[in-house]
Amino acid sequence: MPYIEVKAVEQRFENPESARKLIAALTDAACTVFGEEARAHIWVVVDGVPASRFGVAGKPLA
């Protein structure tokens, strides 16, 4: 079973449609690799992280 985990700043997912679109797109991408028969077994987890706990280049985003 493919398991795909995405972590991003939580503000990216304020609109619930954003997470739905990302989940669908990642599932479709995995199916191009594993085949359509894998679709029922592909898990996608989208995790929003507060900007204060997300760092880039050694510094928190907030």
Where do the protein language model's features map onto the residues?
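A domain-level signal for the structural core that forms small-molecule/cofactor-binding pockets
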Residues: M1-A62
